[in-house]
UniProtKB/Swiss-Prot annotation:
The keyword Lyase is annotated on this UniProt entry: no
Modified residues (N6-acetyllysine): 90
One Gene Ontology term from the biological process aspect of the record: ribosomal large subunit biogenesis
InterPro entries given in the database record: Ribosome_biogenesis_Nop16
Alphabetized Pfam families for the sequence: Nop16 (PF09420)
Gene Ontology cellular-component annotations: intracellular membrane-bounded organelle; nucleolus; nucleoplasm
Family: Belongs to the NOP16 family.
Protein name: Nucleolar protein 16
PTM annotation (Phosphothreonine): residues: 8, 144
């Protein structure tokens, strides 16, 4: 199809436009990424935040959701019954969030593999002799006997079952040698 006739002018750079402000405003208006996957999948971009959260059964403002009780004015039982319950159209989001919250928390603190190997090596070769451990050539960081003892105690505290298995294996080795 032929091009429509008319004046075409070249694009000129707009020097009068403040690009810094334009970019800042664009960043402010851009919708943030919703971290919670349950909420993100149920989100309707055509609706407002308040409408979306109301459909999911979540509160926009926690202060309004659970207000402080006022001691002077007591609500009558009739008033409480007359208040309409909000309709929850997406209850599965609320159920998923509650199920996720009820799961046991993962143990986040662990020791590095290097520290575990270091402790095992020291105990394997020196037993309870911390001074000999401090003089060992594998003591790269030149830990003092007390520092080595504390590292071993940390290992015992973090992995008590593994520590017991390790000690049992050492006992078996000693029995085999004798």
């Amino acid at each position: 199809m032929p091009k429509a006739k008319g004046k075409t002018r070249r694009q000129k750079f707009g020097y009068s436009v403040n690009r810094k402000r334009l970019n800042r405003n664009a960043r402010r208006k851009a919708a943030p990424r919703i971290e919670c996957s349950h909420i993100r999948h149920a989100w309707d971009h055509a609706k407002s935040v308040r409408q979306n959260l109301a459909e999911m059964g979540l509160a926009v403002d926690p202060n309004r959701a659970v207000p402080l009780r006022k001691r002077k004015v007591k609500a009558m039982e009739v008033d409480i019954e007359e208040r309409p319950k909000e309709l929850v159209r997406k209850p599965y989001v609320l159920n998923d969030l509650e199920a996720e919250a009820s799961l046991p928390e993962k143990k986040g603190n662990t020791l590095s593999r290097d520290l575990i190997d270091y402790v095992r090596y020291m105990v394997e070769n020196h037993g309870e002799d911390y001074k000999a451990m401090a003089r060992d050539e594998k003591n790269y960081y030149q830990d003092t006997p007390k520092q080595i003892r504390s590292k071993i105690n940390v290992y015992k505290r973090f992995y008590p079952a593994e520590w017991q298995d390790f000690l049992d294996s050492l006992q078996k080795r000693k029995m085999e040698v004798e």
